[in-house]
Amino acid sequence: MPSGVFQKRPKAAETISLFCMILIRLSRAADDSHETSTLLATITTITTEIIPMPDSGRSCFGWSSAPEAAGGNCSRSNRNGTLKCYGGMNNLAALNQSGKLSRVQPALEMLLCGWPKDGLNHFRDLQKLPRLRSLTIEYSGFTEFKFDFPEMLELHTINISWTNLSYISSRTFKRVHPLKVLDLRWNQLIQLDGPLLLPRNFEQLYLAGNPWNCTRNFKWLLLQPEKGRLVVDRDELICTDRKYKERQMLMVMHYKLELKRQCQSHEDLRNCTCLMHHILPKTHIPLYTVNCSHLQFHRLPDFLPDNTTTLVINDNMISDINPLRDNPHYRHVVDMQLENNQISNVDNLEDTYWLQNFRLLNLRGNNLRKLHVYALDNALDDNENANLLLLSRNPWHCTCKFGSRMRELLTKYKDIVRDAWNVSCTYRLDDDQLLAKVLTLSRQEMCNLSVEGGTQIHPIDWLNGVLASLIFLILGKLAYDYYYYKYYGRVPWIVMKMP
């Protein structure tokens, strides 16, 4: 073939060379199987996660097409001493009696494919294979191990992958003393009760590819370095729970430990509950919630962990909320739960950064009687983040001026003040027990019956009456002048006397 053909298609030559290299790698022995999967993983890249391609020589891939699968039997490969069982181990005793598993030709490796039961409980059969060094269980439907693994004198590698295994006890592999490598990738494990109890000389644990729930306790990965280092692929563990979906487990655990350290380092927060409720998608910044309810606080905490966005401090004795204005630790706190405290004044928040940027403010069950309605109105009008404001169960007093403005505010922001219909007030100074819902009170009830006016007719109503009378007087005068001019041809004498 002319050389010019290869010169025009250099990419084709590279592709052929790469394909040949893959074939060579696939034909290598078991010691290179890890390199093979690594090579294939670099070629077969998926945007969300990399799924390893199983090695057909050491895997159960396509096991259901094997002749032994119909009867749940095993077959012995004399070439490498591998015992393959498909859907069960029904003929294992027969193989022993036939001498195919004798000391002269012991089974060194075992593949258990397609185990159909929910629980794998035939581990005692493994003791019939005393020279077994490697055990692989794949493509099986069991969800847990009924019993712990028995003592095995030479079993140093266990691979359990592509199964429905969802629970594993920390003691499952404790008695396998020669164990050095344990591969639990690509199962359905959600959590571990704690670090697995493994032999002293254990070397490598693989856990990637499982749907881990990072709301559970995996802090031991960082708190117990000698245990955490055994998890070779710890950087690849991904959370799948709703709260931390697609986040790295190590990152989530690091943030949890840092939050715990900050909360325990400050005296105000030692009895509080500190939680991480979210991690921002792009920046991976953690957002924290601090709950100090029912702890007899007389003031807001002086310190909050970095990135705290929610403070729940209900059912305490707090009366001063000035830290929302002055304390820089509260700058990023957008949700404040202050229900059932002793707050009587919120006017200090007027024109503050916090009031113009808050998202949730719960002031139910406090001692509020009045507030600057215009300041709150301006803040809610400018605040695009405001989502919830709760004001009910306060001893509001509706004077004529405040009550009217409060009613307008509740009507205007009913989508934000969601308990607006439950906001009640007293509207008579001589009867503090007479409560009415602000949205149902008329202006006449708030003004005419108020002791503030001293009479049943408010001065504003008197002024309105006078102005109305003057208007009617002017209109009457114009009508008289028009009539007089029409019938007498001249304006009234009083107009003639005017300069």
From Swiss-Prot:
GO cellular component, one term: plasma membrane
Key word Repeat present: yes
SUPFAM superfamilies: L domain-like
LRR repeats: 154-175, 178-199, 307-328, 332-353, 357-378
GO terms (BP aspect): intracellular signal transduction; pupariation; response to ecdysone
InterPro entries attached to this UniProt entry: LRR_dom_sf, LRR_TM_domain-containing
Signal sequence residues: 1-29
Domain LRRCT intervals: 210-265, 394-449
Domain of life of the organism encoding this protein: Eukaryota
Record keywords, A-Z: Leucine-rich repeat, Repeat, Signal
Function: Has a role in the ecdysone induced cascade; probably indirect control of 'late' ecdysone genes.
Name of the protein in its database record: Protein singed wings 2
Taxon lineage: Eukaryota, Metazoa, Ecdysozoa, Arthropoda, Hexapoda
